[in-house]
A protein has these predicted regions:
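Alpha-helical, largely C-terminal catalytic domains
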Residues: 1-194
Length: 194
């Protein structure tokens, strides 16, 4: 008989982990919402790579990787970006902590399922770059929403995030920025939904 697993119950708690802990947010965001949005953008970047740039890409795999990209935060919490990326030593140490948390989560699964989930926590270097770009696009969208709500607290974060995306030199992310980002400035009527 298979023992009970807490893997899915623990994943459902992602909604209790707030993002942007050091910022005064007008629009609260949690890790579960962020992971969904990152998955949408990762999928989009994969489709852009395949359909616009004619390169081989498994967009669905990117979406799955993005769904789980912050799962370790259930155990580690959301470490603010300025701390996480303060220097290489700290970044590398935190990567080890995240990896250990991922391993702990996977160990909660029954053996029969574990192998199927391991690939969702293991990305190639190329996949990791695209998921990171999607992660940054999600952060940028949050910054834009905060600015639109009159919250100047996010202006610097918006500039830094734009610069970080540009410095990735990913044609897919550049295409998204050029062809999709402007729509986030529009209201519902301007988006033509009616």
């Amino acid at each position: 008989m298979v023992k009970e697993t807490g893997f899915y119950a623990l994943l459902s708690r992602m909604r209790y982990i707030s993002r942007w802990g050091l910022m005064r947010s007008s629009i609260p965001e949690n890790v579960q919402e962020h992971s969904h949005e990152t998955a949408v953008y990762a999928h989009a970047l994969g489709i852009i790579r395949r359909e616009i740039f004619g390169k081989e890409c498994d967009a669905e795999r990117l979406a799955v990787l993005a769904i789980y990209h912050d799962a370790s935060e259930i155990l580690t919490g959301d470490l603010p970006t300025p701390i996480k990326y303060h220097d290489r030593t700290l970044r590398d140490a935190y990567k080890k902590v995240e990896h250990a948390a991922d391993e702990r989560l996977l160990a909660m699964l029954p053996e029969e399922l574990r192998g199927a989930y391991e690939s969702a926590f293991t990305a190639s270097e190329d996949e990791e770059k695209l998921v990171k770009a999607a992660d940054k696009l999600s952060a940028l969208r949050q910054c834009i929403e905060e600015r639109k709500a009159g919250n100047r607290e996010f202006l610097s974060a918006e500039e830094q995030t734009c610069r970080a995306i540009e410095e990735m030199h990913l044609p897919e992310a550049d295409w998204f920025m050029e062809h999709c980002l402007g729509a986030f400035e529009k209201n519902l009527d301007e988006l033509g939904t009616m």
